[in-house]
């Protein structure tokens, strides 16, 4: 389906002189984007929502999928250790100093680890005083290459993470892990659960954690994002000076493996049961190779994703109508298009439905019927027009609220641009482009694609 959809989009945008030749979309001129000599990327933007504050992020384009078999859980463990001392801020000094200026650990100061990325953030940091700006940048610097990883802190954190593992080990997580094992069968994703396993967390050597850190926390896999009430020139100068002691990686440094999920000749069928689950649900995934990153910030990529949005909106309306009927076959359901959020090389068309108690078969039949109805008959002109108006209204709201965008919303756009290559246009250009492409779309394009 992806090849057909890609061809249709290329044909569709070919009628527009603005979109001709797979035009690369312009970047917002209000954001300063650069790359240091060591390979580290940075994004800086002045924004006063809220005034007097800024948010600071460092994105590492590595995660649990980079672990060796004897390092399972260490990407997440390393994330915890980033708050337990660094070269310039030993032990709990980072947390203590930030708390004196109103930045609270767990609320404004946080991080997360995924399969393919690790992200650290300092949100809503007051920056009227330059020393606070300097502190936040110093923390980003230390998170890049200068986490201490002291033995006593590692041993102390083992208990914290083992308790987290026990606390999180509920039916929802077990169901998620089972789904991942089936969706990504035959790849490393099948064997990585982010937090690791009890035996490994108890017994891993410090050297394993250090090896993971030194091997993968490198500047060419890192991006800084600073958005807030700051002087862009000043912040850029500070970044260049402060990050200068982070060396570029050697030519023979390890490279990330691009993991492709193999196709299967037969459908993968999985039934997961757990006495702790309170509801039954059914899901169907049609997997496909993701749109390449280099196409995302182009007119082709934009139109490709727009077609997916149209289909999701129209199918959502169908599922909502069914769920609201008397004696509906399911409580709710829908369809989503695009990334599953785990493996960057895989996309899917996903149908789902939540079943009434004892009526799982009914939910599946109704869901499958809607999938087949879409595949065989497509959509009507009326459905398309309603979806078009909904998408246009959403786009207009984005434009209307363009002067009220929070620091973290801008930051997320820039993080997505770095990680996924998604568009980063200014509000005026995006609004004009939306109107042009949405109004150019028609139901025949959608139906041919699906």
Task: Cite the ranges covered by each PLM segment.
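Sec-dependent N-terminal signal peptides
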Residues: 4-14
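Acidic/histidine-enriched alpha-helical segments
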Residues: 91, 95-99, 147-166, 231, ...
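Mature N-terminal segment immediately following signal peptide/propeptide cleavage
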Residues: 24-58
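Scaffold signal of the M16-like zinc-metallopeptidase fold and its non-catalytic homologs
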Residues: 22, 84-86, 111-116, 132, ...
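Active-site-adjacent, His/Asp/Glu-enriched structural segments that form or flank metal-binding
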Residues: 51-52, 60-175, 203, 208-221, ...
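Structured mid-domain segments that build the active-site/substrate or prosthetic-cofactor binding neighborhood
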Residues: 282-284, 289, 301-381
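An aromatic/glycine/proline-enriched structural segment found at the starts
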Residues: 24, 186, 223-280, 389, ...
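His/Glu-based metal-binding/catalytic segments typifying zinc-dependent metallopeptidases
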Residues: 251-319, 352, 408-422
């Amino acid at each position: 389906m992806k090849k057909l959809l890609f061809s249709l989009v290329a044909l569709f945008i070919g009628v527009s002189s603005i979109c001709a030749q797979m035009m690369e979309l312009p970047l917002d001129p209000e954001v300063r984007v650069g790359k240091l000599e060591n390979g580290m990327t940075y994004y800086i933007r002045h924004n006063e929502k809220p005034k007097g504050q800024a948010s600071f992020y460092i994105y590492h384009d590595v995660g649990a999928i980079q672990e060796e078999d004897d390092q399972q859980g260490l990407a997440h463990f390393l994330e915890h250790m980033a708050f337990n001392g660094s070269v310039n801020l030993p032990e709990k000094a980072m947390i203590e100093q930030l708390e004196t200026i109103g930045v609270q650990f767990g609320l404004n100061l946080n991080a997360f680890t995924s399969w393919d990325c690790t992200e650290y953030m300092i949100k809503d940091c007051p920056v009227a005083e330059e020393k606070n700006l300097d502190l936040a940048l110093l923390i980003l610097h230390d998170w890049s290459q200068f986490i201490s990883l002291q033995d006593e802190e590692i041993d102390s954190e083992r208990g914290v993470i083992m308790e987290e593992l026990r606390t999180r080990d509920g039916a929802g997580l077990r169901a998620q892990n089972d789904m991942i094992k089936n969706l990504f069968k035959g790849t490393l994703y099948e064997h990585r659960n982010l937090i690791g396993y009890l035996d490994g967390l108890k017994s891993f050597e410090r050297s394993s954690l250090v090896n993971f850190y030194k091997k993968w926390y490198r500047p060419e896999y890192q991006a800084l994002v600073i958005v807030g009430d700051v002087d862009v020139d000043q912040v850029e100068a500070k970044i260049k000076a402060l990050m200068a002691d982070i060396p570029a990686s050697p030519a023979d440094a390890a490279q990330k493996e691009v993991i492709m999920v193999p196709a299967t000749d037969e459908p993968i069928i999985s039934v997961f049961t757990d006495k702790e689950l309170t509801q039954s649900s059914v899901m169907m995934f049609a997997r496909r190779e993701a749109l390449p990153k280099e196409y995302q910030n182009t007119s082709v990529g934009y139109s490709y994703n727009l077609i997916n949005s149209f289909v999701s909106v129209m199918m959502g309306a169908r599922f909502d109508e069914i769920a609201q009927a008397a004696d509906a076959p399911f409580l709710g359901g829908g369809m989503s298009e695009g990334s599953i959020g785990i493996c960057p090389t895989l996309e899917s068309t996903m149908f789902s439905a939540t079943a009434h108690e004892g009526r799982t078969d009914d939910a599946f039949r109704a869901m499958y019927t809607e999938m087949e109805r879409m595949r065989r008959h497509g959509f009507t002109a009326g459905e398309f027009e309603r979806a078009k108006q909904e998408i246009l209204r959403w786009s207009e709201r984005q434009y209307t609220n363009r002067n009220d965008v929070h620091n973290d919303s801008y930051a997320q756009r820039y993080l997505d641009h770095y990680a996924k290559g998604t568009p980063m246009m200014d509000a005026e250009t995006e609004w004009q482009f939306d109107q042009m492409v949405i109004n150019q779309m028609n139901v025949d394009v959608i139906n041919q694609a699906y």
